[in-house]
Structures are given as C-alpha cells and as structure tokens.
Amino acid sequence: MTTLKIGTPKEVFDGEARVAMTPDSALQLQKLGYDCAIESGAGVLAGFSDKAYSEAGVEIKKTAAALWKDVDVVAKVREPDDGEMKRLTADHTLISFFNPAGNDKGLQAAAKKGASVIAMEMVPRISRAQKMDALSSMANIAGYRAVIEAGNNFGRFFTGQVTAAGKVPPAKVLIVGAGVAGLAAIGTSTSLGAITYAFDVRPEVAEQVESMGAEFVYLDFKEEQKDGAETGGYAAVSSPEFREAQLAKFRELAPEMDIVITTALIPNREAPKLWLKDMVKAMKPGSVIVDLAAPAGGNVEGTVQDEKVVSDNGVTIVGYTDFASRMAAQASSLYSTNIRHMMTDLTPEKDGVVVHNMEDDVIRGATVTFNKEVTFPPPPPKVQAIAAKSQEKPKELTPEEIRAQEADAFKAQTKQQVILLATGALLTLGLGLIAPVSFMQHFIVFVLSVF
C-alpha cells in the first residue's frame, strides 16, 4: 500500500506567521506512518528553517502548486483562499481553520469537489478532544499576549512598588470574560503583580477566577444562566435586564481601571458590545483597552480591526486580530501538536492510512464536508450517562437481633473500660514503687481533679 503524504503550504493570508507543521510534529507524524512535505519558507516567520525540516525528514517543495499536487493530507492554519480552493481535489483531506459558519461558498465548493474538510475550530469541547482543541490553544496564547500588549502601551508598572523615589501604586486590570483567553489573561496579569478583577456571565467560573488570585465581579442580579458545558464553554445570550445590570457595573468600574481586556464571544454571532463610549470616556488618560473580540466585531465601541487607536481622552484601544500570530513560534508548536493528535485519531492502526470514522464524536464534529456532502453543522455530542450503582436496601432486623446487637455492644464497651482501668491501675502502682511520696500525693490530687 502506498504511504500517504501530509503537506503544509506557506500561509497566504497577509501577515500570518504561523505554520501548521513544525520539525517536531513532523517526526511524530512519521511515526504514524506518513511521509511529510512542506513548501519552502513556510516555517521561516515562525523560526523554523528549511534545513530544520530537512533534518527532520521532511521533503521541501519549491512551490505551493507542487505541494498540493503531491500530498494527500493538507494541514493549514488559515481558511483557504480562492486560489487554494482551486487546488483542492477529491483525493485531499484538508485540516485547517475553515470558518464553516461564515464560509458557505467554501463548504459548497469543497463538497462539490468531494474533498474531506476537517475544521479545527469545530473540534467538540469535550474532555477526550482537549488535545485537539486548537481554539483553546490559540485563545490561551491570545490571552497571554493581550496582557503583554497592554503592558507595552501602559505607562506604568503592573506591580506596586515602594522606592526611594516614591510609591508606585499597582495597576488595576479588569478582564471581561473568563473563558480560556480570559483565564490566561488573569494568570498573566496576577503574575505581573496587578490587582486583577474578572467578570463573566457564568457564575460557575468564579471559583476558577478566585483560585488564580483575581477578584470576581458579582452582579446584584438574579438570572438563570446556562452552564458553560451546555454552550461549549462560551457565554450564552443574556436578557435585556441582565445586560443593563452588567453595563451599570462596568460604568461603576470604568473610572478605577487602568487596563481592560475584553474576551466575550458568542458562537456564530457578532461579539456583544460591552464597553461603550461613555465607559471609555470615564477611564483615566493613559489607560489601555485590549479587545480580543475584534475579529467578531469587538466588545468595545471604538475598536478598529487590526489597528491601535487613541480616544480623545487619551485611552488606547488595541484591536489587533493576530495575537496568536504575534507569538508564531509558540502558536505553531501548539497548533501543530493539535494537528498531530487529530491525525493520531484518524490513523488508529498507525499505518499511514486515514480512517475517517464518522461514528467518532470528535471526527464527526470537526468534519464539515465528507463524501461530497456538507456535514456542517454537526449533531450534538453524545453524552454517555454513567449509570448509578444500585444501592441494596438495608435488611430490617428483628427485635431479637436488635437486642442481641445491643448486648454485644454493651459487652464490648464494658470489656474496653475494664482493660483501661486495669492498665491505669498497674501504671499507677508501678509509678508508686519508684516515685517519692510527695510526688504521688500531688499526682493523686491531679487525677482526682481531672475526673
């Protein structure tokens, strides 16, 4: 049987520095029985040279056309553009971010060609799939980088200091949204010494937030929120009343905060506007807002995608959409590991043959086209309930059995007391033989006072 080949082309999206295959991940893919290929220069921006790939046994292809023609599985980062879609054939399995909810044209084109497409953002958020969860991997990096970016634009220390030149107060940081990106931002902010606050509509994350050293911002409002497990770890749409209470709390916090990082997203919807113009105006000059929801329209009024702007009152609003790409080496390492784990599930025999098992919850959930059909959206994951162990009803005792048990218990208790008294008497007698008379008098008084 011919060995299948996995290939990674150079990303064509302007400014994208990540790569879907690293030399380390290529070595692991080869252990699964695959040959590996990469377009020349694909890993340069992430710090991986062609020489490093060659030393890892990866074939270097001079052009993207040559690579697409020669490989069976294509691993990418960004969704393919029109030129790449033209190169896609029925013999290809494409593994990439694909934006299936907003890319109907791409879905139809891939299905018509007969290609199998696995969208990495569609990996179900279940325990077994965590190793393949590319969204979480990239969100983790984005949350960390958001704090670093905020610090780069903030004119002071994060931590408070007392120096010979005077006292420096700690920065106050508010994280809106405590998902993967939010928790990463909280961890980074607290480790830098800032006083960190966090808000999320899901009350179950409060314990996580507080365990990381941040203060959870509670609302004085009663509303049943969906559990995070029901919404894939994302927030659900809130009621108008809850939103008003939420905005009122943000208006209260705005004048105190030095840095605000927003991360709130709702699947397949525009990001909710949570930090409005009046809140920006209420912030101190020199404050910084980082809007991680900028790719979905932004949580902040005034965010400009891929730009950094300064408001009239001196508040910097960062709307970059490439935080993960700004840490290309780390992001490529994590993403390529997600790809490798996906390939491991697709290769159960480790023989270099793709087995596209649509009965597998993870593979089915991530597959958006298969056998010339659009398979998006996927059915909800099957949650197997664990049957509770049947508890045997305790046997009812007869009056005779109860009396017998009570008698046995009385005998055991009496025996224990006799042994303790006898032991105490022997110890006292032994002590009296060797101790002075005056000591024994004091000892007897002490024992009597205890009892």
Where are these regions (language model features)?
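Rossmann-fold NAD(P)-binding glycine/threonine-rich loop
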Residues: 101-127, 269-322
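Glycine-rich phosphate/diphosphate-binding loop of Rossmann-like nucleotide-binding domains
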Residues: 9-47, 159-253, 406-413, 435
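An N-terminal-biased, well-structured beta-alpha scaffold segment characteristic
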Residues: 2-109, 113
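Adenosine-phosphate binding glycine-rich loop
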Residues: 121-163, 170, 294, 300-387, ...
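Structural signature of hydrophobic alpha-helical transmembrane segments
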Residues: 437-448
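Cytosolic-side membrane-insertion boundary helix
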Residues: 392-422
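Glycine/serine-rich phosphate-binding loop and adjoining beta1-alpha1 elements at the start
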Residues: 2-5, 11, 82-172
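A structured beta-alpha segment of the ubiquitous adenosine-cofactor-binding alpha/beta core
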Residues: 57-69, 79-80, 227-260, 264-277, ...
